[in-house]
Amino acid sequence: MRQTKTGILLANLGTPDAPTPEAVKRYLKQFLSDRRVVDTSRLLWWPLLRSVILPLRSPRVAKLYASVWMEGGSPLMVYSRQQQQALAQRLPETPVALGMSYGSPSLESAVDELLAEHVDHIVVLPLYPQYSCSTVGAVWDELARILARKRSIPGISFIRDYADNHDYINALANSVRASFAKHGEPDLLLLSYHGIPQRYADEGDDYPQRCRTTTRELASALEMAPEKVMMTFQSRFGREPWLMPYTDETLKMLGEKGVGHIQVMCPGFAADCLETLEEIAEQNREVFLGAGGKKYEYIPALNATPEHIEMMANLVAAYR
């Protein structure tokens, strides 16, 4: 019987190559052109994207990226590379590649990197703990397009999500406990997930249920009363309704009601990025404090912490 050689493909969203309007425009064009992300009629969407959204948003978003840019690139790229390298060290006999749905390194370059290592089985781990058609579904689509162009394709194991994975929940819980020990236990732990249009959920995307699963399991692991944990959704885009309650509006309401101390975690992000470091850690902090809140801390993503890497190793082990 022929022995199988397995490789691991870590997949994430992607990032601009530089904090410049030109680089951000290239990235946003690719991202916002994906039907998994925006499924509006192309006849309506293309003119709006090209003539309004990209020209107006690219310079503003570039300034935000510049405010969090690190020596090795964007935070998402830096932490994703650290994850790749740490997992490769943890699994020295297994090639590990990193691919992004948008920007570089692309998913295609990651597949080619693994095939050059003569693997005949690839375990694909999209680093989105909660499935959504707009994230995990986009990875699946691109992977199918890539493999459709290959004469010989490897076996594929595709991890749909890990919203209730025991190691993942424990890693989150330990991160929360460390934050409580450092800053004191807050009046409320707010778990903020990236939003999706409500229409997507109505049409069958089980993302909100997967977010609720993570929230329930994490609250249970922390032995926190239900009223001490709240789930919200951030980063809505466009005019149609998105999943509610909205994070920014909730923080404003809580500050106005006299809630003094809040800590915020984003369990749906495997690595810190512009969204967590700027929108959640900075913008939403100002919203809460401006509404009367007294103390606000953001709990970082798991990034390349040893516990997170061990979780990844255990997760892919079942498919190797």
UniProtKB/Swiss-Prot annotation:
Q: How does it assemble?
A: Monomer.
Keyword tags: Cytoplasm, Heme biosynthesis, Iron, Lyase, Metal-binding, Porphyrin biosynthesis
Primary enzyme class? lyase
List of residues binding Fe cation:
H194, E275
Gene name, Swiss-Prot/TrEMBL: hemH
The lineage's top-level taxon is Bacteria
GO MF assignments: ferrochelatase activity; metal ion binding
Role: Catalyzes the ferrous insertion into protoporphyrin IX.
Which SUPFAM superfamilies does UniProt cross-reference here?
Answer: Chelatase
Enzyme Commission identifier(s): 4.98.1.1
What pathway does the annotation place this protein in? Porphyrin-containing compound metabolism; protoheme biosynthesis; protoheme from protoporphyrin-IX: step 1/1
**Full protein name:** Ferrochelatase
Catalytic reactions on record? heme b + 2 H(+) = protoporphyrin IX + Fe(2+)
What organism is listed for this UniProt entry?
Escherichia coli O1:K1 / APEC
InterPro entries for this protein: Ferrochelatase (IPR001015), Ferrochelatase_AS (IPR019772), Ferrochelatase_C (IPR033644), Ferrochelatase_N (IPR033659)
The family note in this entry says:
Belongs to the ferrochelatase family.
- GO process annotations (BP): heme biosynthetic process
The residues that cross the membrane are none
Q: What's the source species' lineage?
A: Bacteria, Pseudomonadati, Pseudomonadota, Gammaproteobacteria, Enterobacterales
GO terms for cellular component: cytoplasm
**Where is the protein found, in the record's own terms?**
Cytoplasm
